[in-house]
Amino acid sequence: MNNIYDIVIIGSGPTGISCAIEAKKNHFSTLILEKGMLTNSIYHFPTNMTFFSTSLKLEIGDIPFVSHNEKPTRMEALEYYRRVIEHWELEIKFREEATSIGNQGNGFTVSTINGTYDCNHVIVATGFYDNYRKLNVLGEDLPKVKHYYDDVHPYIQQKVMVV
């Protein structure tokens, strides 16, 4: 028989982590389900990316976010969020994609690729980065086509089109 969680959170980005911390502070049993790795979207940001926000504005869970510059880098953010989940001892199941949410009595059942989890409440904190919009034009599924910016180096002295 499955444990029944007070809250199941889908997504381990900053919003999902923040929700889990607040739930833990209020003594709710909480599970985070993540289809990829911790802060999966941030991991897929361009390698040398710098955030627009200051580290102070990105802090969560009462854990200071110390950066070498006024605005943190992607790598600093990845390290920071690792420290946050370790400090708060959050229960996270990585590489376990939620596939459906169903009603179950007074609560919900969240189905994943590995099983099911019963809970009283569900928070969907999946973000928007994975939800790019295709244009349905010829060639957009070719291997050379990118739907996200990743790095400029491979495109130096090349003809490119940005839409």
Predicted segments, located by residue:
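Rossmann-like dinucleotide/flavin-binding elements
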Residues: N2-Y5, I9-K35, Y148-V163
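Conserved beta-strand segments of alpha/beta enzyme cores
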Residues: S29, E91-K93, K144
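Glycine-rich dinucleotide-binding loop and its adjacent helix/turn
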Residues: G127-V163
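Short amphipathic alpha-helical segments
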Residues: A20-E22, Y43-H44, K134-L138
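Helix N-cap at the beta1-alpha1 junction of Rossmann-like dinucleotide-binding domains, i.e.
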Residues: M37-T39
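Glycine-rich active-site loop/strand segments that organize a redox cofactor
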Residues: S29, Y43-E79
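Feature captures the FAD/FMN-dependent oxidoreductase FAD-binding
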Residues: T73-N131
